[in-house]
Amino acid sequence: MLEIAIGAIIVALIFDFVNGFNDSANSVATVIGTRVLKPIHAVGLSAIMNFVGPFVFGVAVATTIAKGIVQPDDITVYIIIGGLAGAIGWSTLCTYFGLPISNSHSLVGGIMGAGIAGLGFEKLVYGGLTKVFAGIVIAPIGGLIVG
């Protein structure tokens, strides 16, 4: 069982790398491209803010991903690994082809798919999924209105 736990940690770290590879570039591209910040400063600032963010703004999104997609009592380490692997594969493929991608959406889809494959549709938390999908729809509309 220790080997499986270590494997899950390694897969989570790979997902984190893929997430940083994609999302960090999105967040710093403008300030680097316009020469407001040097690349080293932009990446350093991004790293610091990604670390500080959960302490300042909380972990509500992470809690929803952890408990609001699949029934938390039924999740196994294999579902976690499967969800992360699906998100890694999809994010890597889209990044390779230059397609716009949200790793958060990839993670939700990966966990949802692994949960359905391993436990069935009845173990999905539809209230949590409604919240997630509402955010996916509302956020771009809000950005369009405000921006």
What are these regions (language model features)?
Residues 1-147:
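Alpha-helical transmembrane segments and immediately membrane-proximal extracytoplasmic
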